[in-house]
Amino acid sequence: IAAGEVVGRPASVVKELMENAIDAGAGAITVEIAHGGMALIRVTDDGCGIAPDQCQTAFLRHATSKISSEYDLEAIGTLGFRGEALAAIAAVSRVELLTNQGQGLGTALSLEGGQLVEQEEAGCPKGTTMLVRDLFFNTPARLKFMKKDSAEGAAVFAVVQRLALSHPELSV
C-alpha cells in the first residue's frame, strides 16, 4: 500500500529520482525510458553519489540522509526528506543502482521486489545511475490501471519538463 502512495505510475518514479538527483547537487541529469517507463527507466546524474555503506540503507523505508536532527525539520531545504521513495520504487520493480562519490571505485547494487540481490564494487563515474525495470512486475493488479505506453511516456515528459523549467541551473 505504501508503495502505491509514492509510485503510482512511471512519471512518479521519474519525479522522485530526479528530485533525489537535484538534492544530490547534480548539474546534469539524463532520463531515459522504454515503453512509457513500464519496461525501463534510467536516471543518471553527476551529483555527490552515495557512500558504499549507505547504498542498502537508502532503500529502507523512512531512511533519509537529509535529516540528521530534529532541528533539520524546521528548515528543510531539499525536495525529499521522508525516506519513502526508493523503498517504494524498489518494492514494485527490479532496481539497479550504480553510484560513486568520485573517489576510487563505486558501488553497484541490485534489488528485486525490494530484496537485495547483490552489492559489489564497480567502476563508474562520479554520480548516480538508477535503473528501474519491469515496474509493477510483482503487482499485476496495478498493471491494469496503466495507460498506453504513449500516454505514460507523455506524463514522464511532462514531469521532466516541469522539473527542468523550475531548475534552470540543470542540464536535462
Describe these PLM feature segments.
Residues 2-172:
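N-terminal phosphate-binding caps/lids of nucleotide- and nucleic-acid-binding domains
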